[in-house]
Amino acid sequence: MDMERNRLYFFYKRDDKLIERVKPLIELAERGPFVVVDDYREANIIVSIGDDGAFLQAVRQTGFLPDRLYVGVSVLPARGFYCDFHIDDIDHMVEAAKNWKLEVRRYPIIEVTIDGAASFFCLNECSIRSQIIKTMAIDVFIDDLHFETFRGDGIIVSTPTGSTGYNKSVHGAVVDPLLPCFQVSELASLNSNRYRTLGSPFILSGSRTLTLKMSEETSHFPIIGLDNEALSIQHIERIDIRLSDRVVKTVRLKDNSFWDKVKRVFL
């Protein structure tokens, strides 16, 4: 890790219990070669303290900054996919930094554009579902090709790192984050003599654009999930999803690869 990066911003929930647990970490940083700042825009390292959900919030609320390093520190008994460090093991963090046992990993993110105007980024996934108990009808385009007309509860579009989350729970594939791609998975699709979809997840190259065109009856009540946040916009006609040119840079232990984490969590 570049030691010229020494301005830290700590992102965490300001409750009394967590403040007490974070205090020794801040004190250690201030005694070392780091400067702790109160504004993330002044930092070049953003440290998220909590769990994977907190890490997603940290990245989103600081604007998916491509020139910052993000570090995940867990407060739970087990480390997550984005948290390589544990708050109760400060010595391990210090030892790893001193002995160059860290490396920077660049994770792909997807860009979601709604009706050609508002754009949002996702590190895990974007999901499109109905706010009411009603089947959605969505025309699915890959680039300019009309691929299928989907009818069902919704669609999940996930990044490689997000493939272990919501996507996996609907039997999507786990994808290596070194692959520049994104995955499309169905939520309870209708398949019959009348309606037909592919009926399985599919993976698109990072050079592709996925376009979802809502039917008139579907456009009134969609809810868009952006990682762990929900966006409710009425009268959506079109959603374009592509792999962004941006990446999120994270600091991880060299001996804790993505597949190490998959094995630890699922096997």
UniProtKB/Swiss-Prot annotation:
BP terms from Gene Ontology: NAD metabolic process; NADP biosynthetic process
Gene3D superfamilies according to UniProt: Probable inorganic polyphosphate/atp-NAD kinase, domain 1, Probable inorganic polyphosphate/atp-NAD kinase, domain 2
GO cellular component: cytoplasm
Active site: D52
GO molecular function: ATP binding; metal ion binding; NAD binding; NAD+ kinase activity
Keyword Chaperone: no
Annotated keywords: ATP-binding, Cytoplasm, Kinase, NAD, NADP, Nucleotide-binding, Transferase
Stored SUPFAM superfamilies: NAD kinase/diacylglycerol kinase-like
Protein name: NAD kinase 2
Residues annotated for NAD(+) binding in this entry: D52, G53, N124, E125, R151, D153, T164, G165, Y166, N167, K168, S169, A188
InterPro entries hit by this protein: ATP-NAD_kinase_N, ATP-NAD_kinase_PpnK-typ_C, NAD/diacylglycerol_kinase_sf, NADK
Function (record text): Involved in the regulation of the intracellular balance of NAD and NADP, and is a key enzyme in the biosynthesis of NADP. Catalyzes specifically the phosphorylation on 2'-hydroxyl of the adenosine moiety of NAD to yield NADP.
Catalytic reaction equation(s): NAD(+) + ATP = ADP + NADP(+) + H(+)
Cofactor(s) for this UniProt protein: a divalent metal cation
Entry's localization field: Cytoplasm
